[in-house]
Each structure stands twice: as C-alpha cells, then as structure tokens.
Amino acid sequence: RVNQVTPKLFRKASNPLKMSKLSQDAIYKIIKPCGLGPQKSKAIKKLSQILVKEYQGKVPQDIALLEKLPGVGHKTASVVVAQAFGIPSFPVDTHIHRCAQRWGLTSGKNVVTTERDLKKFFPIEEWNKLHIQIIMYARKYCSARDCYGLECPICTSSVSYTHLRAHET
C-alpha cells in the first residue's frame, strides 16, 4: 500500500517545505489506506518541519540522523539511504527475514540479527540490489502462508528444505 499511497502524497507535496505546509488532516486522508494514519500523519508533518528547520529542507544521508526523525525506524532509514542515495544498506523487512530463515542464511529470531547475518554473507556492493530482489522474489514465490518448501524454487533446493518438510502437515 505504501507504494500506491506515496505517489499521491508526493503529488500534493513534493518536498519537505510543501509537506510541512499541509495540514495533518490532509496528510491523513491520503495515507489512511496504509493503516495507523493518525500516528503516521503526525510523524510526517513533524519530520517535514524538522527537515525544513534543521536540515534546510534536505533529507539527511545518514542512518543515525534519519532514525532521530519522528516515525523513522531503522528499516525506513536504511531504505532511504539505499534507494534515495545509493549508500550500501541491507534493510530487512518481514519478507527478507522470512526468506533468510527459510533459506538457511540466518538463525536469527529478529530482523536485527538477520540484517547482521546477511551483511556478513553478501558482498557490500550487492546489498541494495538484493534487498529489492529478495522482496520481489518473496512476494512471488515465498509468501508467509503459501510456501512450505514446495512452491519456492530456492526453498526446495536450500538447506532449509528438510526443515520445512519436517514441519508440514
């Protein structure tokens, strides 16, 4: 839903200054389909104001600075630096976490551990590309409910296949 809502929001306000001038209610009406609209609209309004006041309307290219902004967690900050600025980062969402576990690339129980493991496993120059590729692959072949090692070509040939087969029924 974010990918559907973002273009609509950016048509209304294409930069932090314009965004900061929108009312919280106007932002809410656009982003409501994403869920948590009241909290997210408040965060978007506030972070836009901060970007204008403290960063001259520019988005910081540093994960630590981004994480200090309202509503911006580690994954979002990582996506921004990777996709907007091309800075190597390996954002781990639920799709990537699930696939990495199924494929035997991590035994991590959370995205922090999974991110650490994937960064060790893959070369830094591949991180940004792999982030997108794994998400797209997961959506097509290895969804949360539908993949038990049978539909996913990687799961059927990975070290996790035996584990997945053992948990079917």
Can you name each region flagged by the protein language model?
Residues 1-165:
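Catalytic cores of DNA base-excision repair glycosylases
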